[in-house]
């Protein structure tokens, strides 16, 4: 298992970025794919038309999102934490993704950089 941490700058305020990460209609705007998302803890989510699935664990509006990402029946859980920091250019998103299966690590990192945050950065450019 591996962990990944990185900061991503976005040119939008934290409250706006939070909405873009937690509301299905907003997610669909920057991904171009079907999304199922709730801002309630203990709910399932699906992104990129089911390519990413998991469970929402914790929300602190405008500040923090914690999710369990599913990789089959993997144990321990793969946890994604997004902390939104105000930044002079908008928001700096602190991503921490723990317990990534070794065989999925490179694909996950590429997905974060190109698909997930790459799409968000392009959306806000």
Q: What is each stretch, according to the model?
A:
Residues 28, 36-39, 43-100:
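Hydrophobic-ligand binding "helix-grip"
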